[in-house]
Amino acid sequence: MAPSNAARMQPDPDGDFPDRMTIRYVDGSAPASLWPDPEAAARRAGFRVVDRQVVPTARILAALSTALDLTEGQVPGHALRTCYLATRLADAVGLREADRETLFSAALLKDAGCSSNAAAITRLFGADDIVLKGRQATTDRGLLAYAAFTIRSLPATEPLPLRIRRLIHIGLTGSREQHQIEQLRCERGAAIARKAGFGEPVGAAILDLHEHWDGGGQPRGLRGAAIDPLARILAACQGLDIYVSTRSRADGIRVLSERRGTWYEPDVVDALLEACARGLLDDLLAPDIAARTFALEPGGP
């Protein structure tokens, strides 16, 4: 008969590698003589052992963010570049360490909810949601700008009567539906970040990312200081990268200046423009931007 405290093979208590086994006594303690090489004992017993590898969280998020860039219709590396700009700006303005950590994670996860509204966008415009998202990112606010965006976005392959009906529908309901689309995206992205364990501060920054300083943003129409402070930094940085990477450095700086006090917080814009004058954009499109960004990770190696 086996002793009452016999050693047995039990599943990995962490629960994240169900095929990995470890050796424990019945009472839960570990036999010290087996700890030097428990995996070898598991293999001898016929169990498959999955090696654990420690991969920095930033690298995992960066890989995921590249897929999100494509879904968002942006040049691959957009979230990484936004993260680079935001972290450099955080250093320049002396943001405290905890906020820098939140900002870094929120930048890489900022578009986590971007695929949640794909079906709604396609249904509304009848066109590829990825193309529309990329185009909308460089569309100004206002009735004329939105009308021009809508006309350009209608599928040319559709019969003219159908396009006219779609245009009328968007004119009558587009504002409400666009709000619902943006609300879904922001709320879903924040929820994903929270469920992934990044905490409420990261979720709050993602939720408020598309709010505008003057209250004209989405999804809640927040104004000024009511907007999450880290979201204000991310908003300006992501806007700058979109124009720099799809148009030119001059366009990025011009749009940033034009949106000062409307889309973006004036103090953030001023600090960002000052950093640009000191060469912030010099490395933005460098092929090793990922490595440069990882090197800025708060609390990183």
Annotate the PLM regions:
Residues A2-R8:
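Extreme N-terminal basic, low-complexity initiation segments
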